[in-house]
Structures are given as C-alpha cells and as structure tokens.
C-alpha cells in the first residue's frame, strides 16, 4: 500500500470516527460488541489467545508484542438491529429502522530486537438505542419512546515481551459517552383526583462526559500448537452531565407548558470484565480459538437516576428526579471460532458467540433492550502483498423477552410487555504493515 493511499485511508477513517458521535451504537454482549475488527468478528469474537492484529489492543493488549515494525488497521462495522414491541395496548410494532456505523482505527509500532511495543486505537466501543413510534399510551394518546447511548474511546497501549513466547500489556481507555431518551414526550396527563399519579412526558438530550478504564493482559505461547491469554478491564468511571431535559407540563393546571431543566444521569456505567482464552493450531493452516468472559453488570447498572435542576419556568418544581430500575445481572460470554488458510492468500473464518442476556425480564422496557444471546458469524481475509482485506457478517438470532411485572413504577408498559431483538452486523477491514 503506497504512502498516498495510507494517508487517504487514515484521513477518511478519522473523519468517520469523529462522526460516530453523531450516531448511537447497538451492541450484543450487553452494551459491548461481540468483537472489534472484521478478522475477529469472523471467528465469533474469540481473540484473547490469538491477539496478533493491531486491534488486539482492545482485546488483549499483551498480544501486540507479536507484531514487528509498523502496523495499521482500519475497520468499519455496520449494525442493523431488528426490534419489535408488543403490550396490552399495542399490537406487534416494529422499531424504526436504523443503521449504526461503528469505525475503528489502530496503530502499533515495535522496533526489531526491542521487547517493547506500543499502540494507539480509536474505537466505537458500543452502546444501545431503539425508537418506537406511534405507540398507544395509557393516557389516550399516541406517542413514542426513543433511546440512544454512544461510547467511543482513545486507547493508548503498551506491551512488554518477557521472552519470545510470553508478554504482558496494558491499555488506558479514555473516551466520551452520552445518553438521550424520550418517554412519551408529547403526552401530558393531570389526575385531578390523585395528582401524585399524574403523568408528564419527558425527554433528555445528550447528557454525557468523560469515561475512563484500564485493561491489562497476559499472553503465552506454550508451544507451536497452543497459546493462552487472560485479560481484566476495570469498570468504567463514568460521568453524564450537561444534558437538557424537558418535561411536558402542558396539562398541569399551574404551569400549562413545557419546562426545560439541566440534566444529569447517575448510576449508569460500563461493566468491568475478566476473561481467558485458548488457541490451538493443529496444522499450519488452522487456528481454533475459544474465549470465556465475565461482564460484571450487576455492579455497573442498577437504578439509573436522571435528575433535572434549574427549571426555566418560575413556579415549576425546582428538581425533577426520574428513577429507572435496571438491576442488570452479571453475564457469561463464550466465543468459539476457527480460521482456515485455504490458500496462501485466502483465509476463511467461522464463529459462534453466546452471551447470557443480562436484562432481567421484570425490568425490561423498549427503552433499553440489550437481550440477544446467540450469534453466528462467517468471514474471510485476503492477503495481497503486505496488505490484508477482511470481511465478516454476523447474525444475532432473535431473543424474545416478556415483562410480567405489575409494578408500574418499574414496568410502566404493563404486564405482558414484550420486546424482540435480532440483529445483523457487517464488518469490513484493511490492515497493512511497513518496516521501520
């Protein structure tokens, strides 16, 4: 790949990456993606013990010690979720169709003879979002629900090779995330007999802020056939403020209008994770990989509290507090994949990823569905000179969950509310290497 093409691709990808903050992400292992990079996507996300590409810095940072010289990767994944909702007031309703582009760029550099390698990545890490329009509400109106969570990071990474067959590594993730939602924003209902049971629709726009976490990794090649890896990433330190929230008080007898508030969101973060992997090379043309990971959602997402302060209307409540009960569960994820080098230029891949649904049925709402469990993927890589082109397609099979919780404070959509979630993901990548 010539220098002009390198600069052009980097410029284009950087532009797209900066633009990712204009689009929400959809994820399939809770709020994380099953994989990062088309090569890894093709084998179902199994990569902890392989980790021999630049985007390994987002899986197992120790893996970049296997690279010599300068290595670059550009990747674009496009997610197409398919969501349906049904409850006692609404027949089965399709979510608004949306496509979510998720770019990634990574660079790794290591001098021959040096045990040190370092890298830098820009990645769309994950998130979630759903839009349901024209829903019947319990208040005689038709309205919408909408949500989006977006999360991207800059990831500086360093690895140290203890010897040619063992390495350790560390990454620091510094990024930005924001969240928005609309919950029947055009509906306003005042209950004169029981004012406490009135309903005033709400909408929050882009409460966001800095997100930081750390990842450490270990990689060991036991012999020419077996390699092993392990990783741990801390829970993200999250901040969500600077949002704008409006409450629809049009039906309120004293206010009669929408009121805007400064919004913050607390109790929402991205889970810590731990994992281990094994790779087996029965021949020079085959790689079989298996990963097990644990996402600690139970500590990360319980009750998410949105608070509005500083109303722009005199006489409005000085503070509005909206609690959303999530109570997510810890999640086991299993990834199994294979690479087959059919020819010196062509590699074929296939993989399976199973991630337990972390969302309890009693807290599920169409605002934040993240329920898919089973994923099947296929992919291919084409080597031309010092450049590799990768492609993968993943199907997240439909997961249907019904919330029978009668408590309207937790399940405002009523017993029998059902959400179906399936998804297609297509990934494209190009990587190349140069000498120092």
Q: Where are the regions a protein language model picked out?
A:
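Outer-membrane beta-barrel porins/channels
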Residues: 26-41, 86-92, 99-436
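Outer-membrane beta-barrel pore proteins
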Residues: 48-70, 107-115, 127
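Asp/Glu-centered strand-loop micro-motifs enriched in Gly/Pro and often flanked by an aromatic residue
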Residues: 45-53, 90-95
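Bacterial N-terminal signal peptides that target proteins for export
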Residues: 1-12
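Bacterial Sec-dependent signal peptides at the C-terminal "C-region" and cleavage site
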Residues: 20-26
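Bacterial N-terminal signal peptides
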Residues: 10-20
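Transmembrane beta-strand segments of Gram-negative outer membrane beta-barrel proteins
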Residues: 31-47, 65-83
């Amino acid at each position: 790949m010539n220098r002009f093409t390198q600069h052009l691709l980097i410029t284009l990808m950087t532009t797209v990456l900066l633009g990712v903050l204009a689009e929400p992400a959809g994820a399939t292992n809770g709020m994380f993606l099953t994989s990062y990079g088309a090569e890894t996507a093709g084998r179902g996300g199994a990569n902890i013990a392989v980790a021999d590409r630049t985007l390994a810095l987002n899986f197992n940072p120790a893996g970049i010690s296997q690279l010599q010289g300068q290595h670059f990767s550009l990747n674009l994944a496009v997610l197409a979720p398919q969501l349906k909702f049904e409850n006692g007031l609404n027949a089965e309703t399709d979510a608004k169709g949306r496509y979510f582009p998720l770019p990634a760029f990574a660079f790794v550099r290591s001098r021959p003879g040096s045990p040190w390698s370092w890298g830098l990545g820009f990645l769309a890490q994950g998130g979630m979002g759903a839009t349901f329009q024209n829903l019947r509400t319990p208040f005689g109106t038709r309205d919408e629900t909408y949500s989006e969570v977006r999360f991207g990071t800059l990831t500086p990474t360093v690895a140290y090779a203890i010897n040619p067959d063992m390495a350790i590594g560390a990454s620091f993730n510094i990024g930005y995330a924001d969240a928005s939602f609309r919950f029947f924003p055009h509906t306003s209902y005042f209950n004169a007999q029981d004012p406490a049971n009135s309903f005033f629709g709400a909408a929050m726009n882009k409460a966001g802020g800095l997100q930081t976490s750390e990842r450490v990794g270990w990689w060991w090649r036991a012999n020419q056939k077996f390699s092993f890896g392990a990783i741990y990433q801390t829970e993200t330190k999250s901040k969500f403020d600077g949002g704008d929230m409006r409450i629809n008080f049009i039906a309120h007898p004293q206010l009669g209008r929408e009121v805007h508030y400064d919004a913050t969101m607390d109790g929402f973060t991205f889970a810590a994770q731990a994992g281990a992997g094994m790779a087996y090379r029965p021949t020079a043309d085959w790689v079989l990989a298996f990963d097990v990971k644990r996402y600690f959602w139970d500590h990360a997402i319980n009750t998410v509290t949105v608070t509005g302060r500083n109303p722009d209307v005199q006489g409005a409540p000085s503070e509005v507090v909206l609690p959303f009960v999530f109570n997510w569960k810890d999640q086991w994820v299993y990834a199994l994949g294979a690479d087959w080098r059919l020819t010196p230029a062509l590699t074929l891949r296939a993989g399976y990823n199973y991630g337990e649904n972390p969302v309890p049925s009693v807290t599920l709402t169409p605002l934040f569905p993240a329920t898919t469990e089973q994923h099947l993927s296929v992919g291919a890589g084409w080597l031309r000179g010092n450049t590799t082109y990768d492609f993968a397609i993943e199907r997240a099979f439909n997961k249907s969950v019904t919330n029978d919780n009668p408590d309207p404070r937790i399940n405002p959509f009523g017993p029998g509310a059902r959400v179906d979630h399936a998804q297609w993901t297509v990934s494209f990548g190009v990587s190349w290497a140069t000498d120092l």
